[in-house]
Amino acid sequence: MAEDGSPKIYSRPPRDNSKTPTEADIFFGADNTIPKSETTITSEGDHVTSVNDCTPDGDFSTTVNKLTPTKEKLKLEDDIEGCLKLTTLPEKEITTPTETPNSKPKGSITENFIPVKIGNTSSPVGTVSLIDFSSNTAKEDIFLTTIDTGEKEVVPTTEFSGTLEDSAADVEDASGFPDESTETDVPSSATSDAPDDGAVQVTDSFSPEAGVPPSTEKEVTTIPDITNIAEENVTEIKLIVSEDRPKTVTKLSDSEEEKFITVFELTNSAEKAKDNVEDPLNDEESTDGANDWMEKETASEAESHAVLLTAVESRYDFIVTASETDNVMEESHVNTTDLPENETTESVTNVTEELPSVTSIVDTLKDKEDLSTTNSGLFKLLKEEPDDLMM
């Protein structure tokens, strides 16, 4: 107590004057006014507290129980100043808008075009921050899309529009309290502080909207074209089989040794099949040996058998020319006239049914004319007599 009985008044030591104007101008509260610091003397008379603008005036009273101690109040002020330093942007990153939105209440703010100047992007990751402050959009609905800009320098001037309804309350809540669950953890994010004029501040880490790839775009895998594979040269040999002869067998072999496949209708009687007695063909009979051989076999026909002979099995190259085919047709009708009526009809039918299959083989083997024989006969004897292999 003083000598005159009045309580002692202690003046607070001067604060540090090295604060930036930004730290001094950022505040909390919705009344948009900066109350002056005032001195409050408690009823005890021995405590002097300097009250700043961190708490509304209605929270103070003259009782010691409701008053925060001086040390705790100073600690709280230091914590708040540290939070303000974290949320304060450097001077070079802040671009003031060219238009100040109207200070009317909600629903009266229209669209404003804010030009944003973008400097050199030093970090490889640029943040695209397009924030639409609409009336139905909460703080949780603000998304930040990051893209890789590499080492390129982006110096465009971009304008974007947005409805600034309800921007003052939303931005103050998002930037003033760092411990809220809605605060983003992106290091280079767009921080917005709304002073009394409602201005929006955007950082310089802003990439043009054209560089953002659309999220709905999907990667399309190109399937290689497999139709360009070279086709193999396949030689097709059509063996036409008569419908009246279901027992006739046809085969196609890819072996180089089995070059030619010929189907012969061999008709043997039961007695000749048992005795294995046949007249051999000599060189003189080789000119029309095919016709004579077929005539002798069909003379005493009892039953017919379909036999398939290949070049490897019989060791013969069976080659038919067009001239020999015509000769067989003509001679078959002439030489079978002396036979009985039943056998003549059967022998002529056998020759005429089998000739289409032989003709088709001749047509498909035109490119192998060097292997064809002359008009000397149907068979070219290689090693053995044909009678040794006939069944």
UniProtKB/Swiss-Prot annotation:
Biological-process GO terms, alphabetical: flagellated sperm motility; spermatogenesis
Matches recorded under InterPro entries: Ca-bd_spermatid
Coarse class of the protein's main subcellular location: cytoplasm
Induction notes from the record: Down-regulated by Busulfan.
Keyword line: Calcium, Cell projection, Cilium, Cytoplasm, Cytoplasmic vesicle, Flagellum, Membrane, Mitochondrion, Mitochondrion inner membrane, Phosphoprotein
Modified residues (Phosphoserine): 253, 269, 314, 347, 357, 372, 376
Pfam family, one: CABS1
GO function term, MF aspect, one: calcium ion binding
GO cellular component: acrosomal vesicle; mitochondrial inner membrane; motile cilium; sperm principal piece
Free-text tissue specificity from the UniProt record: Detected only in testis. Expressed from stages X to VIII of the seminiferous epithelial cycle. Expressed from step 13 to step 16 of spermatid development (at protein level).
Compartment(s): Cytoplasm; Mitochondrion inner membrane; Cell projection, Cilium, Flagellum; Cytoplasmic vesicle, Secretory vesicle, Acrosome
Segments of skewed composition (Low complexity): 90-101
Acidic residues compositional bias, start-end: 278-287
Reported phenotype of the disruption mutant: Males exhibit significantly impaired sperm tail structure and subfertility. Defects in sperm flagellar differentiation leads to an abnormal annulus and disorganization of the midpiece-principal piece junction.
Region (Disordered): 1-23, 90-110, 152-221, 271-299, 330-351
Keyword Phosphoprotein: yes
Function statement: Calcium-binding protein. Essential for maintaining the structural integrity of the sperm flagella.
PANTHER family, alphabetized: CALCIUM-BINDING AND SPERMATID-SPECIFIC PROTEIN 1, TESTIS DEVELOPMENT PROTEIN NYD-SP26
Name of this chain's protein: Calcium-binding and spermatid-specific protein 1
Native source organism of the sequence: Mus musculus
